[in-house]
Amino acid sequence: MAHQLKLLKDDFFASDQQAVAVADRYPQDVFAEHTHDFCELVIVWRGNGLHVLNDRPYRITRGDLFYIHADDKHSYASVNDLVLQNIIYCPERLKLNLDWQGAIPGFSASAGQPHWRLGSMGMAQARQVIGQLEHESSQHVPFANEMAELLFGQLVMLLNRHRYTSDSLPPTSSETLLDKLITRLAASLKSPFALDKFCDEASCSERVLRQQFRQQTGMTINQYLRQVRVCHAQYLLQHSRLLISDISTECGFEDSNYFSVVFTRETGMTPSQWRHLNSQKD
C-alpha cells in the first residue's frame, strides 16, 4: 500500500503556541489524498471541484462547508476555478473555555456530520471574520494568538448559526435565490427537477438565474445536478449492496442504461467497474 501523505503542523503554524491559522487556496489545485496532524474548517467561495472525504465524493461549489478532523483522509480533483479557505487549528492548543466539542462536529474524533452549507448571508459574515483572523494569525505582536483564538471562537459560533444541511435550507431563511436553487437541486437526487417551475415559484428570470449560477459555480445547472447524482451513485456503489438498476433510480435516473452512459462519461468507467475497483478498498 502506498505511503499516506500527511500534512504536519510544523509546516503550517508559526510556533507551537499558535492554535489557529488561515490557509488560502486561490485557487485550490488538484491535491492527492492526505491526512493531517491538525484539524480544519473548509469554506468554498466559488468555482467547483470534486472533494473526496473518507472515500465519499462531494461535488463542491460556493457555500459548501466541511469540518475536517486530523484523521480524516481527503483529496481534491477535477477542479475548475475552485476558490476556498482552510481555517486550520490544533485542538490541544485551544485555551478558550468554550464548548468546542459541542460546536464543531467531529472535534475530538472523526465522527459527526462533516458536510454542511452556508447561504450568502452566512458566507458574507464568515468572510469578514476570517479576514480579521487571517490578519491576527500572521502578526508577531503581543496577544496575537489570543486574539486569533477569540476570532476563531466567533467564527465557529457564526457557522453554527448559519449552517444548514445541503438539502434543507430553513423555511424562514432570507437567503438568495442561488442558495435556494442549490438546496433544491440537492433535494432532487431521486426526483426530476424543473427549472421553469422553480423560477415560476420564485418569480425570477430563468435566463438571469442560469447566468448567476454559472458565474458563481463554473457549471451549468444541469451539469451540477448530474455530477451531484453521480457522486451519490459512486457512494452507493461502494458502500451498499443495491443493484445497479436500483442505484440508478435512487440517483434520479429513470433509465439504467442512460445512467450507465452518464456515469461512464463522468468517471471513465462503468458502474460495475467502479463497484469492483472500490469494493477492494473496504
UniProtKB/Swiss-Prot annotation:
Enumerate the InterPro entries for this protein: AraC-bd (IPR003313), Homeodomain-like_sf (IPR009057), HTH_AraC (IPR018060), HTH_AraC-typ_CS (IPR018062), RhaR_RhaS-like_N (IPR047220), RmlC-like_jellyroll (IPR014710), RmlC_Cupin_sf (IPR011051), Tscrpt_act_RhaR (IPR023699)
Locate the site labelled Interaction with sigma-70: 246
Keyword Ligase carried by entry: no
Q: What is its main location?
A: cytoplasm
Report domain HTH araC/xylS-type positions. Answer: 179-277
- Transcription regulation: present as a keyword of the record? yes
One GO BP on record is: rhamnose metabolic process
Q: List the disulfide bonds.
A: none
SMART domains given for it? HTH_ARAC
A family per Pfam: HTH_18
Query: Which UniProt key words apply to this protein?
Result: Activator, Cytoplasm, DNA-binding, Repeat, Rhamnose metabolism, Transcription, Transcription regulation
**According to the UniProt record, which residues make up the DNA-binding region?**
196-217, 244-267
Where found?
Cytoplasm
Which terms does the record give in the GO molecular function aspect?
A: DNA-binding transcription factor activity; sequence-specific DNA binding
What GO cellular component term, any one, is given?
A: cytoplasm
Subunit text: Binds DNA as a dimer.
Question: Which purpose does this protein serve, as stated in its record?
Answer: Activates expression of the rhaSR operon in response to L-rhamnose.
Q: What is this protein called?
A: HTH-type transcriptional activator RhaR
Gene field? rhaR
